């Protein structure tokens, strides 16, 4: 059973599977590996064909890299009005290697259509009243094939 069959069985409405086929197509362009473009056959005579791979400059990847470098680079500064909050956020971003991973995932966003940065609390301790005593804020980085929106309203997931 694939994920879409599971969603259907549980009566969960999500993005149609055809969208994920498009993501796979975009990824093949990004990797310079489009089946009907980068691969072709050459007739060798006497009924023989040779399968060939077209050379590529990898321009789709280059465009995605350039887009990512414009969006998230060393000149980008994330600022918050409150100094204490800004220090905390900067520390979380540094601990999660955000400038490097964020740029890498901006490239993947340009290639596949979307990415998600998912913050979560690791190694958390909770008291009897449900208050969080401590923990480490971490960030999961997800790319389009691993994102399945379960609900959205007015464009917000």
Model-derived regions: residue spans:
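Extended, helix-rich architectural segments
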Residues: 1-142, 147
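Short, intrinsically disordered, charge-balanced linker/junction segments flanking boundaries
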Residues: 150-157
């Amino acid at each position: 059973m694939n994920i879409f069959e599971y969603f259907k069985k549980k009566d969960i409405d999500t993005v149609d599977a055809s969208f994920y086929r498009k993501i796979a197509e975009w990824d093949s362009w990004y990797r310079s590996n489009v089946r009907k473009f980068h691969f072709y056959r050459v007739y060798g005579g006497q009924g023989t064909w040779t399968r060939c791979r077209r050379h590529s400059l990898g321009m789709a990847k280059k465009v995605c890299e350039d887009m990512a470098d414009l969006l998230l680079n060393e000149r980008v500064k994330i600022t918050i009005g409150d100094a204490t909050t800004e220090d905390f956020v900067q520390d979380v971003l540094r601990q999660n290697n955000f400038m490097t991973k964020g740029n890498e995932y901006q490239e993947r966003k340009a290639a596949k259509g979307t990415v998600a940065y998912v913050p979560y609390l690791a190694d958390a301790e909770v008291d009897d009243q449900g208050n969080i005593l401590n923990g480490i804020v971490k960030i999961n980085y997800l790319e389009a094939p691993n994102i399945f929106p379960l609900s959205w309203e007015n464009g917000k997931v």
